[in-house]
Curated annotation (Swiss-Prot):
Record-listed ATP binding positions: 311-317, 332
Name of this chain's protein: Isocitrate dehydrogenase kinase/phosphatase
Family: Belongs to the AceK family.
Role summary: Bifunctional enzyme which can phosphorylate or dephosphorylate isocitrate dehydrogenase (IDH) on a specific serine residue. This is a regulatory mechanism which enables bacteria to bypass the Krebs cycle via the glyoxylate shunt in response to the source of carbon. When bacteria are grown on glucose, IDH is fully active and unphosphorylated, but when grown on acetate or ethanol, the activity of IDH declines drastically concomitant with its phosphorylation.
Known EC number: 2.7.11.5, 3.1.3.-
Entry's localization field: Cytoplasm
Active site (catalytic residues): 367
InterPro entries recorded: AceK_kinase, AceK_regulatory, Isocitrate_DH_AceK
Length: 574
């Protein structure tokens, strides 16, 4: 290879990242127009397009590099010089952290995810820690209640870039003041002020005003979801002011916000429970989130004396799941062979996981990160898990002596399996869990997702008590399913027969059958019948299908119905 080529390659990679991020910003900047035009299908398409941008531009850069090098192989010293040149380009580069992840992606594509060493990749950042903590420009504006909170909120709302009419701005402002007074008290509220992000956060059918409520005793989140009426008028649906509520809004089971990456550091104060990876994931920088997630894993591994074990819960028929006992993620490997009743391929399973990545997860499907050639030290693997890996996934494992390499796996947020949760709780907690499970099914269905296997073991409970679906191998679109009523028996003997008295075709689903496994527990059955009996009726599911086919996009709320202003204060007049 001629000398000087290393710098050209480094510049080509960085220029490729510039092109990718420019398109990312272009798609993001269209969010306001899509919201104002209530073009909800364009919102969904933009989300998918933004996800695909990254891999598309990595592919373009890889092709450029193959042309530059004429397809010649490169030695280790050459690659190290490329990385050195790339590193020298970053000190004055504003998006250095994401640019490092882009370099990693190009390298992995070129070398088929092999030889992934810290010398060749930015496994940890090349830049000093202070750069991560520096906010490059003012990202928010302060508002003080010099003339009272009504005047303050009027200024905040009037500053918004939205061009639609408000349904009743005065009403919404009084709702917010009432909520803040109930939360803080009159005296504390008078001594507090707001800091509001310059950018609105767009997701699904809402535009979120995100701010910080700075009080005498500390800083709280200040989140206002702005929706549209059927007539295209704006209204504020609620006000959220706790870190738990904010954490759910920015949760790992939700679609990515249409907003800019520079806001990550600013958000950290109101989302103290979120890791850096989770913050980048929330705003749609999922590839850099993957880098940060891997860094968090390495840091945890360095500081613990734990071994990987099989994850608690009922063993899956498709996935082998393992974890570190104190770590908040699970690792999922597709088995070499599935249980006989699982008539599918590994490629089908991967396609299902990709569908979830691109689809609106409505707060009910866990996001995942996909890794290839994942290296584990044998000393970190319990003997029982090693035996299980070799038994269930040997075709995906390469033995390197002191290490093994797993050809492909997913990393996902760890939750308590719902079946275990239901065994451990009672009273109101049990009731809440059953309500959450039914709501999860409804919201998935409204988003055109049918889970397929609805057993409790395929759902998890988050630290905030939300129920989230995480087993995707049987997932499909609602519009692909044929929901049928079970025909009446022809003779009394039909109900006693081992085989059904009616024909069953692929894609047929009989909701009446859900009752057999969802209501078998006498503690759960009555609660389910009380709250979710309509899930056992085929006509309920067919009605949802009709709404989807008619193009209706359901509203998705990141909070409980009882928190909506229309429910809390609906009868109040201002």
């Amino acid at each position: 290879m001629p000398r000087g080529l290393e710098l050209l390659i480094a510049q080509t990679i960085l220029q490729g990242f510039d092109a990718q991020y420019g398109r990312f910003l272009e798609v993001t900047s269209g969010a306001q127009q899509r919201f104002e035009q209530a073009d909800w299908h364009a919102v969904q398409l933009a989300m998918k397009n933004r996800i695909h941008l990254y891999d598309h531009h990595v592919g373009l850069v890889v092709e450029q590099l193959r042309c530059i090098t004429n397809g010649q192989s490169t030695d280790a010293a050459f690659l190290l010089r490329v990385k050195e040149h790339y590193t020298r380009l970053l000190p004055d580069y504003p998006r250095f952290e994401i640019a490092e992840s882009f370099f990693n992606s190009v390298y992995c594509r070129l070398f088929d995810h092999r030889s992934l060493t810290p010398e060749r990749l930015f496994i940890f950042s090349s830049q000093p820690e202070r750069r991560f903590r520096t906010i490059p420009r003012p990202l928010a504006k302060d508002f003080h209640p010099d003339h009272g909170w009504e005047s303050l909120l009027m200024r905040v709302i009037s500053d918004l870039p939205l061009r639609l009419r408000w349904q009743n701005k005065s009403r919404d402002i009084h709702y917010i003041i009432r909520h803040l007074t109930e939360t803080l008290g009159t005296d504390n509220l008078a001594e507090s002020h707001l800091q509001v992000a310059n950018e609105l956060f767009y997701r699904n059918k809402a535009a979120w005003l995100v701010g910080k409520l700075i009080t005498p005793s500390g800083t709280l989140p200040f989140l206002l979801p702005i929706h549209q009426t059927d007539d295209g008028e704006l209204f504020i649906d609620t006000c959220l002011t706790t870190t738990a509520e904010a954490s759910i809004v920015f949760g790992f089971a939700r679609s990515y916000f249409m907003v800019y990456a520079a806001l990550v550091e600013w958000l950290r104060e109101i989302l103290p429970g979120k890791t850096t990876a989770e913050l980048y994931m929330a705003i749609g920088c999922q590839k850099h989130a993957k880098t940060e997630s891997y860094r968090e894993y390495l840091v945890y591994l360095q500081g613990c004396n734990e071994q990987f074990i099989e994850a608690p819960g009922i063993r899956g028929m498709v996935m082998l799941v393992f974890t570190l006992p104190g770590f908040d993620r699970v690792f999922k490997v597709i088995k070499d062979k599935f249980a006989p009743q699982k008539e599918m391929s590994a490629a089908h399973v991967r396609a299902c996981y990709q569908l979830v990545k691109e689809h609106d997860r409505v707060g009910r499907m866990a996001d995942t990160q996909e890794f290839e050639n994942f290296v584990l030290e044998k000393r970190h693997i319990s003997p029982a898990l090693m035996e299980l890996l070799l038994q269930e996934a040997a075709e995906k494992i390469t033995d390197l002596g002191e290490q093994i390499v797993i050809r492909h796996l997913y990393i996902e947020r760890r939750m308590v399996p719902l079946n275990i949760w239901l065994e451990q709780v009672e009273g109101q907690q049990l009731r809440d869990a059953i309500e959450e499970y039914g709501n999860a099914i409804r919201q998935l269905a409204a988003a055109n997702i049918f889970p397929g296997d609805m057993l409790f073991k395929n759902f998890g409970v988050t630290r905030h008590g939300r129920v989230v679906f995480y087993d995707y191998d049987e997932i499909c679109y609602m519009t692909e399913v044929n929901f049928r009523d079970i025909p009446p028996p022809r003779y009394p003997e039909d109900e006693l027969a081992s085989e059904p008295w009616y024909s069953v075709s692929p894609g047929d689903v009989f909701p009446e059958e859900f009752r057999h496994w969802l209501c078998a527990d006498p503690r759960i059955g009555p609660l389910f019948e009380e709250m979710h009996a309509d899930l056992f009726r085929a006509d309920y599911w067919r009605a949802l299908q009709n709404r989807i086919r008619e193009g209706h996009v359901e509203d998705v709320y990141a909070y409980r119905r009882r928190q909506r202003f229309s429910v809390r204060y609906g009868e109040m007049l201002f």
